[in-house]
Amino acid sequence: MKVYGVVMAGGGGTRLWPLSTSRKPKQFLNLSGKETLVNEAIDRLSGVAQETFIVTNASQAQEMLSQTAGRVPEDHILKEPAARNTAACIGYAAMTILKKYGDVIMCVVPSDPYTRDEEGFRQTLKSAVAAAEETDALVTIGIRPTFPST
């Protein structure tokens, strides 16, 4: 079954102020010294997803196209009709991909996490994809919590 990556990158730039602003939200920052966060997320999906989509808001779509030039086709940059957070973002991507490609596996990642072990993360994604294929179920991955937090 084909695997499509989805990068959630619609944040408004409010959580990492003053580095991140509404004019330059976190996903467009280069915090590692290598790439912008959104491009690192796209790269993280390589070897797992055959194609990658980015969900962003309409006001950031042009900058997203510029920032991801050559990595993601223009029609793979999805503009959220309204900012409604994670569930709506994933639902919008799922409906768009379902209409275009039918029943596939979607691998959804945020644009802004720090990932120390890129290859280990990629292997975890591959295991999750295999589990989804095998069980025809929703698979989630995450870190084991060590304390309660929001």
What are these regions (language model features)?
Residues 118-150:
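Conserved core of the sugar-phosphate nucleotidyltransferase
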Residues 19-20, 150:
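Short glycine/proline-enriched turns and hinge-like loops at secondary-structure junctions
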Residues 1-7, 15-18, 30-110, 116-120, ...:
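Conserved N-terminal catalytic core of the sugar/cofactor nucleotidyltransferase
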Residues 28, 77, 138-140:
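Conserved beta-strand scaffold positions in the cores of enzyme catalytic domains, especially
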